[in-house]
Amino acid sequence: MIDNTKIRSLLEEGLTVFQLDSIGDLLLDFLLLLNKWNKTYNLTAIRDIETMVSKHLFDSLAILPWIKGNHIIDVGTGPGLPGIPLAIAKPDLQFVLLDSNGKKISFLNEVKRQLNIKNIEPIQIRVENYHPNQGFDTVISRAFSSLEQMIKWTQHLVAQDGLWLAMKGRFPDTELVPIHQTYRVERYAVPGIEGERCCVLINNTNKE
């Protein structure tokens, strides 16, 4: 039995930190839908809904300050993480949610329908086979094992003056060694999560 009151309280407490108090109801609806589908389709390894609040919702929202532009893609989005929380927080931005897993894209289409989220476009395709008409301002992912692999497989997606945003745990010293583009690393804290979190911002320009 899910204690909606407790979940709502956890959400409100964290959203106050992000100054996003107004989106609590929609995030809760997303979380409950994710929890329901997860029992059948194994969309995420996290089963505890309270843990989902911090590790899925808050971790996604924490990268908001570094998103660039209006045209965003979340590569390997899975069940819409971080794409759905970001789209809820920023309804004026457009998000493509890319994944090759049909069950996850079916879930995202249901999220779009039930929650009436108009600024997302779930697409089922492998990243190397996706060729949009224009590049994206920000390419987000937490799905790649290394920064080098992320750039390799998504180079064709980023706009000329665009940005890669990779979500990481510990500071990725060794992953940064082969990166030829200019970059910076931003550390951040997530309510309810202990330990280091950071995101790597990589510009689509080579180091001089």
UniProtKB/Swiss-Prot annotation:
Residue numbers binding S-adenosyl-L-methionine: 76, 81, 127-128, 142
EC numbers, comma separated: 2.1.1.170
Might you report a single GO cellular component term?
cytosol
| Reaction it catalyzes | guanosine(527) in 16S rRNA + S-adenosyl-L-methionine = N(7)-methylguanosine(527) in 16S rRNA + S-adenosyl-L-homocysteine
- Annotated signal sequence range: none
Q: What class of enzyme is it?
A: transferase
Gene3D superfamilies the record matches: Vaccinia Virus protein VP39
Under InterPro entries, the record lists:
rRNA_ssu_MeTfrase_G, SAM-dependent_MTases_sf
Q: Does the keyword Isomerase apply?
A: no
Q: Name one Pfam family in it.
A: GidB
GO MF terms held by the record: rRNA (guanine-N7-)-methyltransferase activity
Which UniProt keywords are given for this protein, alphabetically ordered?
A: Cytoplasm, Methyltransferase, rRNA processing, S-adenosyl-L-methionine, Transferase
Q: Where in the cell is it found?
A: Cytoplasm
* Function according to Swiss-Prot or TrEMBL: Specifically methylates the N7 position of guanine in position 527 of 16S rRNA.
- Similarity remark: Belongs to the methyltransferase superfamily. RNA methyltransferase RsmG family.
Protein name, please?
Ribosomal RNA small subunit methyltransferase G
Q: Name the encoding gene, please.
A: rsmG
